[in-house]
Amino acid sequence: MELMVKGADALTVSETTFGREFNEALVHQVVVAYAAGARQGTRAQKTRSEVSGGGAKPWRQKGTGRARAGTIRSPIWRTGGVTFAAKPQDHSQKVNKKMYRGALKSILSELVRQDRLIVVDNFSVEAPKTKELVAKLKELELNDVLIVTGEVDENLFLAARNLYKVDARDVAGIDPVSLVAFDKVLMTAAAVKQVEEMLA
């Protein structure tokens, strides 16, 4: 199949990478797994055994008229422990390479179908200036876009850093979440070829 390239000849690409059927269940599973893996999982609360103090019985068992109590660190008490205390945990889910690649192919194919993938011959800025990048994006009528380049472009990455709903990455930096998070994806021809090789 062929992809239209702005300002250049059409690019011949693999049907299996950019023309496959959309697998919603697979994409959902991989996106959820990717987001789960990004969770810190460092929250921690103390159980009744971990809260300091509470060694002595607050008052005697009988004769006070109050409810019996054995420790001031019971979860019933205001300064007590937490009944089912949250503990640090690993939220990551296992995703096979085949599934991950399949999800990326599925997303890229859907972007092509919805005319959300824009391919240009080359895209760069001369200096790390946000103003320069804004002008370039205005020419292409883009405001909510992920820019993917074939190689690390420090000037472009710095220029995009301060823009809302604009991100710039090289091919190694793309993932399922970033591809679905933006309205449009702008790729250079070199990036398209690299993605194709990566997912072959």
From Swiss-Prot:
It comes from the Bacteria. One of its GO terms (cellular component) is ribosome. It holds the Pfam family Ribosomal_L4. Keywords: Ribonucleoprotein, Ribosomal protein, RNA-binding, rRNA-binding. One of its GO terms (biological process) is translation. Part of the 50S ribosomal subunit. This is Large ribosomal subunit protein uL4.
